[in-house]
Amino acid sequence: MSTVFNTTPVDVLAEPMFFGSGLGIARYDIQRHKVFEELTEKQLSFFWRPEEVNLMMDGAQFNKLPEHQQNIFTNNLKYQSLLDSIQGRAPAAALAALVSDPSLDTWIQTWTFSETIHSRSYTHIMRNLYTDPAKVFDEILLDDAIMKRAESIGHYYDDVLNKTRQWQNQIAFVELAKETPEADERLERAIKQEAIAKRALMKSLYLCLHVINALEAIRFYVSFACTFNFHKNMEIMEGNAKIMKFIARDEQLHLKGTQYILRQLQTGVDGDEWVKIAHECEAEAAAIFMEVNRQEKEWAVHLFKDGGLPGLSVEILNRFIDYLTVSRMKQCGLPCEIVLESTKHPIPWIREYLNSDNVQSAPQEVELSAYLVAQIDNDVDENVLAGFRKYL
């Protein structure tokens, strides 16, 4: 992004998602990729605040749990706090400078903001469960099992940031060479170096998108399974389950967004060069998913090292991780080496929490979480109105 506001007229319907013209007017009347506008509207309709959920009863129930079950809950909370600390700033910081599609730009900003709500949720939970929440937060950076997962995510974001700076420097060198009299050879060399830097950045961005996709698709779900299990099979911690249900609902949107971007790049919608990059990076992208698979299985073992939860075990979680990995890799166009023994969902009841439409509750009994706000369809034309007039 060479400027925060491009004053040159641009056909937004012809702009690629990345590496196009600078962004100008923020407009939402037309979109090349309607998916991003739909995701933004859906995310805005989901707006929620963690303080809406009362956790007083959860705190009392948590204090009655045996120590190993308290540790399972706390460690998952720490892990999710770390993941959303990254996601609450990284998508906008790393991707926004490269975006040239207005609807994608708005979606990335909306997505990143929603992640900050998730981070605030963990603070809300900790304040209600622990007498000293600051101590729990301070322990996160000291936990090796958590931090090695952060390193594998942050590395790819940082690589995009570094390669973006290198590319921008090369662009500046090209402009400098143009101003140098009788320096055709220098200009030619600068243009060549800029092209090399741009392609390296494109590869870095493509792999980073897979890292983000794997994070949204797999990394949260061991924690989700444990949190929802407290409510489903132990009939406690309903407030926390509600908050995690809100978070899981948001993550489904974020996952859909990254999957869509990847498939568009892989199919050449934004140019043949992306198809070549997708082919070159296929093995590394698949390896990223398999590494996430391995790390999450390690995390399950770490969580259950001192004891388990009724209804869950390391074996069940491992099958759940494999089930997710196969499905998610297929959805983002990658080959998967895992062969499932069964195609049945290892934790079928979790769908109740991941799909809000499956839950029916009496409003007077529980706080409803399955409602939307500001969901009005404004695309009403004369044909629709004519259909209504027959009832007048």
PLM region descriptions:
Residues 2-392:
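Non-heme di-metal
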